[in-house]
Amino acid sequence: MKLPLPLVAALLALGLGACNSNPNAPEKTPAAASGAPVALPVPDTKKRVLFFGNSITAGLGVEPEEAFPALIGQKIDSAKLNYEAINAGLSGETTAGGRSRVGWVLRQPVAVFVLELGGNDGLRGLPLTDTRQNLQGIIDTVRRRSPGAQIVLAGMQIPPNLGQAYAADFKKLYQEISDKNHVTLIPFLLVGVGGDPKLNQKDGIHPTPAGHRIVARTVWGVLQPLLH
């Protein structure tokens, strides 16, 4: 049977349209076409090193990449270690504030927890019994939320403005907590930096970028052996 030319043209157009219904659709790969398994992206399996502290950890007055936790992250990357550095510093944080927020920060498990708090307690002359209880509470929470996590306690010192006895007891507090809980201690986080005008900002408390580089070396000397 001979079809009219208009009908032939319509059928040809319909056939071509069906062949090209989605010209932008990607071509199927042989694996997809055959139903074979397709490789999925590998999830990030890096272990987390969490820095939990106040404005010194947060890097007040310097760029984020200049703060010592970021510098530790660079050292980790250079050493090709399977870890990532997380900065959970908060300016103005006291041990009481840290104790109240540590559970929220530990929603995901960590491999190493670096605890840098207490300086603001000491500068404000808060009771050392409270500081001790709060630091202990933070350590207890870490061990409950991330069993097996390595804990590093960063010791601090304060000037004797509030009396020699208070300053001495404040300094001893970190060693005592470290001994009681068998955690790794950095005796003084700001060794080589504290009290040096060239390495601190105008407030005399917060390190400059050069000061943070020294702090990072101090922390790395303690932290590196724990990363394996």
What kind of feature is each model-predicted range?
Residues 20-23:
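Bacterial signal peptide processing site
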Residues 97-228:
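Alpha-helical cap/lid subdomain in secreted, periplasmic
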Residues 58, 81, 88, 93, ...:
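Active-site loop signature of alpha/beta-hydrolase-fold enzymes
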Residues 5, 62, 91, 128, ...:
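A generic secondary-structure micro-motif detector
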Residues 27-91, 99-109:
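Serine-esterase "nucleophile elbow" of acetyl-processing enzymes
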Residues 1-8:
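Bacterial N-terminal signal peptides that target proteins for export
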Residues 15-18:
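C-terminal motif of bacterial Sec signal peptides marking the signal peptidase cleavage site
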